Amino acid sequence: MALFEDIQAVIAEQLNVDAAQVTPEAEFVKDLGADSLDVVELIMALEEKFGIEIPDEQAEKIVNVGDVVKYIEDNKLA
């Protein structure tokens, strides 16, 4: 499974939305109905799934699915 599909599955499960709604452009709050607690829990789930740490200052910059994909691509192998 490609990285995007892995991320898409985590987001869909965490936010209880259909995976088809989880597009690179989808914003967590505006498009997927997440609140601030949902976003924190989502970041934690992504950290656990991919074995990475997303510092708070970086997490604040992640507003859509594409941001997550880029961050994980850039940091997963670091």
Curated annotation (Swiss-Prot):
Domain of life: Bacteria
Keyword vocabulary terms for this entry: Cytoplasm, Fatty acid biosynthesis, Fatty acid metabolism, Lipid biosynthesis, Lipid metabolism, Phosphopantetheine, Phosphoprotein
A GO term, aspect molecular function: acyl carrier activity
Location in or out of the cell: Cytoplasm
PTM annotation: 4'-phosphopantetheine is transferred from CoA to a specific serine of apo-ACP by AcpS. This modification is essential for activity because fatty acids are bound in thioester linkage to the sulfhydryl of the prosthetic group.
Protein's GO biological process: lipid A biosynthetic process
PTM annotation (O-(pantetheine 4'-phosphoryl)serine): residues: S36
Predominant subcellular localization, coarse grouping: cytoplasm
Family to which the UniProt record says this protein belongs: Belongs to the acyl carrier protein (ACP) family.
Protein name: Acyl carrier protein
Domain Carrier residue range list: 1-76
Gene Ontology CC terms, in alphabetical order: cytosol; membrane
SUPFAM superfamilies linked to this entry: ACP-like (SSF47336)
Task performed by this protein: Carrier of the growing fatty acid chain in fatty acid biosynthesis.
Protein's UniProt keywords contain Lipid metabolism: yes
UniProt pathway: Lipid metabolism; fatty acid biosynthesis
Xref: InterPro entries: ACP (IPR003231), ACP-like_sf (IPR036736), PKS_PP-bd (IPR020806), PP-bd_ACP (IPR009081), Ppantetheine_attach_site (IPR006162)
Disulfide bonds: none
Database matches in PROSITE patterns: CARRIER (PS50075), PHOSPHOPANTETHEINE (PS00012)
